[in-house]
Amino acid sequence: MNSARTAATAARVLRQLRHDLRSIALMLLVPVLMLTLLRFIFDGNPRTFDSIGASLLGIFPLITMFLVTSIATLRERTSGTLERLLAMPLGKGDLIAGYALAFGAVAVVQSLLATGLALWFLGLDVVGSPWLLLLVALLDALLGTALGLFVSAFAASEFQAVQFMPAVIFPQLLLCGLFAARNTMQPVLEGLSNVLPMSYAVDGMTQVLTHTDMTADFVRDAVIVAACALLVLALGAATLRRRTP
């Protein structure tokens, strides 16, 4: 990998995103609006908002980054941009790292907005450090970016990219512990939830919600989410295609 080529790719993607106001709105505003809506849904029960809102603070960025990244990457391939780039002395690793760096920068802004709004405007009450909450939200957004880059290799159209959401995101959403504690699930489902990265994203948020200090479980959860993001990025580089058949 070449750092200069990676940085150039990231800068190009960011320039394109600057002119795509709809994608920017989806990435930055949708998580904020969803958290605000959730706060007023549980207006009479702030404890419920605290428990669910902390988890969704990580889930919403993951979902939005997954959608935008998968569609944006596929659009580049169908338009022939990836084919032209890969015809140049630019490796697949440089390309994927550049995309990850660009969308990762957006993920930082997204996580700052969502976390700041939840804590200081919506009254989300967490026992632990706000910085740890921000860290998990950022890792979740980066995981969504990695998953989006990966699945874009298997889609032939933007519609197919969206269709991957029920296959990749919805099972994790159901089994992550948001709706029921994972240790109360049927053993097969609990075992399946143990290998899904979103489960550890929710667990990490729960650790911040209930513990004043950084715990060993929090470190484990954060490391697993980060490792999953790196693994999926590596798979994305391995499966990247020049063009859509």
Whereabouts are the PLM-identified features?
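Hydrophobic transmembrane alpha-helices
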Residues: 56-63, 104, 138-142, 167-175, ...
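Hydrophobic alpha-helical transmembrane segments of polytopic membrane proteins
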Residues: 132-155, 173-176, 227-234
